[in-house]
Every structure is written in C-alpha cells, then in structure tokens.
Amino acid sequence: ELDTDVLRDYPSILFGLETAFRHLLTGSWALYDTDFSQGKAGIPINGLIWMGDFDTMLSRIEEKMAAGFRCIKLKIGAIGFEDELALLRHIRAHFSSREIELRVDANGAFSPADAMEKLKRLSELELHSIEQPIRAGQWEEMARLAADSPLPIALDEELIGCNTPEGKRKLLSAINPQYIVLKPSLHGGICGGNEWIAEAEKRHIGWWITSALESNIGLNAIAQWCATFD
C-alpha cells in the first residue's frame, strides 16, 4: 500500500507512484472502470491557445472549433494588456459567448494595484473566468479580488505547496475563490486532488482538472481520473 502522507511534499513523485500502483492493481492501462476507460464515452476538454497576432489566433480558434472544441483557454500577460484586450475583442467580434466559452490564464502577470481595473475590462468580454490574476502568496490581495471582481477567479499556482488537509482548508477559507484548477503533479497527486475537491465543494467553490506538461502516461491517468466524476 502506498504511504501517501510521506509523499505529500513531493506531488509529482506521488502522482507517478499512484499511477504505477493503479496500473499494478488493474493489470491494464484502463485504470478505472468507467465508460471513458472502456472507450464508450468521452470527456469534455478545452483547447489551449497561446497569444499571437490577430490572424494566427483567429486561425487557431477556427481550427479548434472545427475539431469540436467549444471551450478555449488563452494565456495572457505576455504581449501587453492593451494588445491582448484587442485580441480578445477581435475574437468576441467573430464568436459570441454562446458559440465559444473563453477562459484566460494570467499566470500571476497583474499587479495588485492594477488587477481590479484589468479584471473589470476583461469582464466586458463575457469571459468564463481568469486563472491566477496576481502572483501566488498574496492571500489578502487575492481574497479582495475574489470578493469584488466582476470576473470569476480561479486559483492555480496558489495551490502549489499547500499539501496538508489543514493547509487546504486554511487557503480556501481565506481567499474563497470562485474556482480552483487542479494539476495532480503539482497539487498533491490524485489523493491530494480529491482532498482539494472535497474542501472546495464544502464551500461551493467550483473546480476543474488539468495537466502540467505530463507525458502520455500522465495524461492517460489524469483523463481517466476525470472520468470518475459526474
């Protein structure tokens, strides 16, 4: 039996061992008994697009939509906020919020001083949410944004290093975000992810699961774990 408590501070190793133990238990790459693992059903996923020029981004979005994606995540904070805002407006001019759900990830690019104004401007574009608007570790500032922002906030990097159940409860109660984003290799493996989900749901905080540059073995485990949830 895997001692998950000993490995709490090493989430990537923990996730790898959880996957290996699951493979050993099932004797198959079908790690869970679900319709998805049996090839009978799919799971909804988003398409990821990095910021670029108008034509390139529009082309990429059209490609994603042609492939069946209706939820697109865009990285922001790299090419200048005004340019990124213009690109998002350009996208919305072509695709309504009914046609495509847009999520953005700032990776902590905003400062506490200007974050609220940027969030207000982004909210005008009918976005679903923004991940990590300011860098991690600024709990008071993040809590203020989560309470007052017109655009729902999702925590990502904020969760890294918060590995105990007590720590998870403390963080979620202090910041009270609208969403959390779970990456098993960074946020406690599968067992740690389940703890995050349980604590989030007690507080009516939404959540979703994603990846962090894993191999196909890791992506397989993440996708199959996702499929265990309704």
Q: Which ranges hold each PLM region?
A:
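N-terminal capping/lid subdomain adjacent to the active-site entrance of alpha/beta enzymes
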Residues: E1-L102, N107-A109, M116, K120-S123
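Catalytic core of soluble alpha/beta enzymes
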Residues: I79-C226
